Every structure is written in C-alpha cells, then in structure tokens.
Curated annotation (Swiss-Prot):
GO molecular function list: ABC-type phosphonate transporter activity; ATP binding; ATP hydrolysis activity
Gene, per the UniProt record: phnC3
GO cellular component: plasma membrane
EC number from the UniProt entry: 7.3.2.2
Short name of any one Pfam family annotated for the protein: ABC_tran
Signal peptide (residue range): none
Membrane topology type: Peripheral membrane protein
Gene3D superfamilies: P-loop containing nucleotide triphosphate hydrolases (3.40.50.300)
Residue ranges annotated for the ABC transporter domain, each copy included: 2-246
Source species: Halalkalibacterium halodurans (strain ATCC BAA-125 / DSM 18197 / FERM 7344 / JCM 9153 / C-125) (Bacillus halodurans)
Protein name: Phosphonates import ATP-binding protein PhnC 3
Catalytic activity of the protein: phosphonate(out) + ATP + H2O = phosphonate(in) + ADP + phosphate + H(+)
Residues annotated to bind ATP: G35, L36, S37, G38, A39, G40, K41, S42
The keyword Chaperone appears for this protein: no
Keywords attached to this entry: ATP-binding, Cell membrane, Membrane, Nucleotide-binding, Phosphonate transport, Translocase, Transport
C-alpha cells in the first residue's frame, strides 16, 4: 500500500508542487492521475520513488515512511518501484536486450552489470519480458533504430524485468500517436491485471483515462481535487478538475480520433 499523509512539497524556487495531499493507493490498483500541465501530476508520481522529496508530511510504502531514507535505502526502494518515462529513458546506442536486462541492475549490482555478468535466469527473464510486449524480434537491434512506440514497449519490458511491486508511468503516451498510445496502455493494463502490480499512470487525455483506469485522481495546483472510481466520473468532473470547459485537444487520445 502507498499512503500520503499531509504531504506537501515546495520547490527551492518557492513553487508549491504538492499541497496537503492525503491518499491511499491499495495493492494491485490501476490508478490514473489527470490534471492540466503544472497541476502536480509528475511531482506526485515522482515523490513515490523519491525522485523529488516532499518537504512536509509522511509518505508510506508498505507501512514505512520513505522520506527520511538514506541513499542505500533509496536504492533498495527503487528496485521494487519501477518507472516508465515519457521520453523512454533508454540507452540509445545499446541493444534492446542490454536496455531490458538493465532492469536487473538493482538485483545484481553495478560491478556485475558493467561486466555484463547477468545470470542465465535474468537473460531468460528479459527475453520473456520482450515477448510479453511483442517486441522480442528486435532483441539485437539498437534502441535508436526503433520507433517511439517500440521504444516505449522496450521500456515496459525493462520494468517487467525489474520485477517491481509498483509501476509508475509518467506521461507514458504523451509522445505517441493515438493508436500507439492505446497499444502501450493496453500492455500496462494487462501487466497490472496478470501480475497484480500496483500501477499509477499520469495521463493528459481524459477519454484514455476513462477507458483504462479503475480509479481516477484529479489534481489542480498541487492539490487532489477528485479521487474516485472511473465509473463515477463525468464531463462535469473533468471540468471541475481542470477549472475550465473541456476542449477537443483534451480528447485526442480517443479511439474515434485514430
């Protein structure tokens, strides 16, 4: 379980990233966070693996407050919390396999990984992860030879290889076209259901949020302004979250726009 208790974050320049956030996210949930640019979506998601550090409150993962963690404790935390980024975060000049097996880095250590000394089971796990996102045929290609959608699938395979308890996906489809976006979201949803991995995704497109989320968290100006099941969400809910009328560019992730 992930629990935010009165969590606030003020950046060094005085910007309020999070404001008195109280949330509980249960094991195995598929949660989508929505809000305008600058609403605090990325700050919220990045606080869960301490890429940013809240300045007030407590942030508990499995009952333990992660805010006072040492760098050694953070390394251990990041082994069980996988992250998927908008820009894929792959080593472009390395092969697909080398990128995916780097998901084992926290398990084998830096020295072994530098020498490419991964156990056979890890190599087999990496290959199975590529098969699960239907990209195993690209295993020996360089990452920079792949399309954006293929690179994001490699990033998902890397997270799978990590065998995390939690997956955080920060705007994973923002750089992709609608059909590819749906493909990536379908893989994330499938992994969540099959492996029971808690999955938290930031999305801009509200129709896509409605299609894939079990639960939607709405943010505005660093505050949680809505938290409930996707089935309870209406257009009016999104207008309340966004503080304005819904526009066509909020919906370009929709199947009808493919």
């Amino acid at each position: 379980m992930i629990e935010f208790k009165n969590v606030s974050l003020v950046y060094p320049n005085g910007t309020q990233g999070l404001k008195d956030v109280n949330l509980k996210i249960n094991e195995g949930e598929f949660v989508v966070i929505v809000g305008l640019s600058g609403a605090g979506k990325s700050t919220l998601i990045r606080s869960m693996n301490r890429l940013v550090t809240p300045t007030e409150g407590e942030l508990l993962i499995d009952g333990e407050n992660i805010l006072p963690y040492s760098s050694r404790q953070l390394r251990k935390l990041r082994t069980k919390v996988g992250m998927i980024f908008q820009n894929y975060n792959l080593v472009k000049r390395s092969s697909v396999m080398k990128n995916v097996i780097s998901g084992r880095l926290g398990h084998v250590g830096t020295f072994a990984s530098l020498l490419n000394l991964y156990p056979k089971e890890d190599v087999a796990l990496a290959y199975r992860s590529l098969q699960r996102v239907n990209i195993a045929e690209k295993v020996y290609q360089r990452a920079d030879q792949l399309s954006g959608g293929q690179q994001q699938r490699v990033a998902i395979a890397r997270v799978l290889t990590q065998q995390p308890k939690i997956i955080l996906a920060d705007e994973p489809v923002a750089s992709l076209d609608p059909p590819t976006s749906h493909q990536v979201m379908t893989y994330l949803r499938k992994i969540n259901k099959e492996d029971k991995i808690t999955t938290i995704v930031n999305l801009h497109f509200i129709d896509m949020a409605m299609e894939y989320a079990d639960r939607i968290i709405g943010m505005r100006a660093g505050e949680v302004v809505f938290d409930g099941p996707a089935s309870d969400v209406s257009e009016e809910t999104f207008e309340e979250i966004y503080g304005r009328k819904i526009r066509e560019d909020d919906l370009v992730g929709g199947q009808d726009n493919e």
